[in-house]
Amino acid sequence: MNPRRKKRLTIILAISAGLAAVIGLVLYALSQNIDLFYTPSELVEGKGPDKIKPEEGQRLRIGGLVVPGSVLRDQQSLKVAFKLVDNGGHLVTVEFDGILPDLFREGQGIVAQGTLKNATTVEAFEVLAKHDENYMPPEVADATNGMHFKPEYTEAQLKGAKQ
């Protein structure tokens, strides 16, 4: 092999190795930021035909309907815990430390983004509520198959909303 071809081959191999390293680093960085969507049933039973369950500490999004009567608020802080359900009937607890969206209601569809604390508990850092009476995020609509609770409010809740 003459020196010119040897130099050209060395340059091509160096560029290929650099490109492979960059692609590997980009894929590794992206894998750390992927948030997979789960329903409560998929979280408990596993997702797909292989019944793959997320690991504790994994980032994920979970969507379902807030179970009426399950919202527990800490009186000393902004911490809130509530349960989600889908048509599979499995319950998952979501813990959130922050201000819930104005449209958050019991019996309504939500999507929470956070990390898996244990098999049936998600520690959320973001909670998204549906937009109006008729809108439901597509993932939640598929998961619940129209299993929508009509919210029932007490007189105290209705008075509090008018003030």
UniProtKB/Swiss-Prot annotation:
User: Where does it mainly reside?
Assistant: membrane
Question: What's a single GO BP term from this record?
Answer: cytochrome complex assembly
Instruction: Tell me where on the tree of life, at the top rank, the source sits.
Output: Bacteria
Query: One GO MF term, please?
Result: heme binding
Q: Which UniProt keywords apply?
A: Cell inner membrane, Cell membrane, Cytochrome c-type biogenesis, Heme, Iron, Membrane, Metal-binding, Signal-anchor, Transmembrane, Transmembrane helix
The chain's Cytoplasmic topological domains, given as residue ranges, are 1-8
Which residues are listed as membrane-spanning? 9-29
InterPro entries found in the cross-reference section = CcmE, CcmE-like_sf, NA-bd_OB-fold
GO CC terms, sorted: plasma membrane
Q: Which residues lie on this side of the membrane: Periplasmic?
A: 30-163
Q: Name the Pfam families on file.
A: CcmE (PF03100)
Q: Where in the cell is it found?
A: Cell inner membrane
Which positions does UniProt annotate for heme binding?
H131, Y135
**What is the topology of this protein in the membrane according to its UniProt annotation?**
Single-pass type II membrane protein
What is its biological role?
Heme chaperone required for the biogenesis of c-type cytochromes. Transiently binds heme delivered by CcmC and transfers the heme to apo-cytochromes in a process facilitated by CcmF and CcmH.
Membership in a protein family: Belongs to the CcmE/CycJ family.
Q: What is the name of this protein?
A: Cytochrome c-type biogenesis protein CcmE
Q: Which organism is it from?
A: Aeromonas salmonicida (strain A449)
